[in-house]
Structures are given as structure tokens and as C-alpha cells.
Amino acid sequence: MTLELQGVSRSVEGRVHIHPTDLVFRGGTMNVLLGPTLAGKTSLMRLMVGLDQPTTGRILWDGADVTGQRVQDRGVAMVYQQFINYPGLTVYENIASPLRILRRPRAEIDARVREIAAMLRLTPML
């Protein structure tokens, strides 16, 4: 699988967050985004997963243009360095949240939550 950014940029209210950028990420390789605070690493990641839309350029997933595609339809997610959860929700609800957004069947959600909880040794907390 390949993720490609072609001339991708992002500006908000006239302020440039990401200058035009070309990148290729190939499956089976390790890629690292390094830079100081406010360099645009998170902004770039948000563009790649579809949380934000680029001002210019295209984002290709295995050659298919996904630039305007809804984040729910991309089948990708971003894992943050610091765990982000919803403190008002139970462990079960936190794990189930993305699956509910994708409108998965209740039985599938339950099975997947239990599988993930077991992998993370969180079953007693369900």
C-alpha cells in the first residue's frame, strides 16, 4: 500500500500551516516525521488521515485520489503519542466509539471491543 501527497498545502485564515509538500509513504517501510514544535507534523498527519482538507494538492491512497473523501470512508486512523480518550465514557465506550462512528453492527462492535480489551489486558475493566 502507498500513501502519496502531491503538492499538498494547508492555509487557515491566510496563514500557511503546510507549504506545498510532496511525500510518498510505502507499505513495509518505516517513516518518521521529525521537527520542532509548530513545524506542522500534526497538521500534516491530519491531512493524511482526512481530518482536515488541503488547500492545494492531492492525497492518493494506492493511486486513488482520496483528497475529498470523508474521514469515515478512508479506513485509516491517527494514533496520538499521548493517549486521548473521553473521560466521561467507560473503557468499553471508548474502544467502541470509532466503530459506532463507522456504523458497524452491534455484534461486530461487541466482538471487536472484547478482542481489543483482551489484547490490552483491559477485560476486567469492561
Q: What is each residue range found by the language model?
A:
Residues 49:
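Helix-to-loop junction immediately C-terminal to a conserved catalytic motif
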Residues 55-58, 108:
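Conserved coupling/switch loops of ABC nucleotide-binding domains, chiefly the family-specific signature
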Residues 100, 107-125:
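Conserved ABC ATPase "signature" region
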